[in-house]
Amino acid sequence: FNIFHWHLCDDQGWRIESEKYPLLNEKGSWRDCHGFGSPNMERYGGYFTKDEIRDVIKFCEDRFIEVVPEIDMPGHTTAIVSTFPELSCRGVQIPLETTGGIFKNILCAGNEAVFDFCFGILDEVMELFPCKYIHIGGDEAPKARWCNCEKCQQRIKDEHLNNVEELQGYFANRIIAYLKSKGKEVLAWNESLNSGILDDDCIICDWMDRTHKSEAYANEGGRII
């Protein structure tokens, strides 16, 4: 109970200040209306400034609570691809989502600019959060766009992968390798195991009631929450 896992972005909004990518706050932190509960037509959004986040971290540290940030990828990224359409497979402008769900416009795993973006964002996160852990999401990433994306299909060929599930494993492993090079330990949701090639140093957060792959991962020495 002394860990605060802070989910900082999703399809409905980007909630952390970025000095490197200010458009994320100008555009990605705001949606046209609030579709949860009692919908209204008012613009909804906002984000935590870096100073506000530092205040939260200090508040938690004083109470022996460690703050673990999560930047979800490659799915649940509508706030990103609506701000930067060129980071999606189709490059088409889309709005932020206003309801809950699983949405098919995700980061393009065949586009090298996507990795540059992710590394840039994670650099900002690491500068802000002293925690040794970073959560990279990995849940609920539908692959329909990847199946029909020339760049993603070319990446599969170039990296000698077998399918789009392995492409997500490739995506995760590049992010994990980058974070490990910075001295961080990486967490991800249990769907990340579906690729069968995930870095076995990754700590899996199983939110789906002890899935078979998670049990097998644990039995092979993997770390599971």
Please annotate each region the language model reported.
Residues 1-4, 53-74, 105-137:
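An active-site-proximal structural segment forming one wall of the substrate-binding cleft
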Residues 1-9, 66-70, 214, 220, ...:
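Internal hydrophobic scaffold segments of catalytic domains
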Residues 26-33, 123-127, 131, 195:
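Conserved helix-loop functional segments at active or binding sites
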Residues 8-12, 20, 71-77, 113, ...:
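Active-site-proximal loop/turn and secondary-structure-junction residues that shape catalytic pockets
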Residues 10-62, 77-116, 144-169:
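Aromatic- and acidic-residue-enriched carbohydrate-binding clefts of CAZyme catalytic domains
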Residues 81, 96-101, 111-115, 127-135, ...:
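Active-site core of glycosidic bond-cleaving carbohydrate-active enzymes
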Residues 8-9, 38, 72, 92, ...:
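Sparse, context-dependent recognition of short Cys/His-centered cofactor- or disulfide-binding micro-motifs
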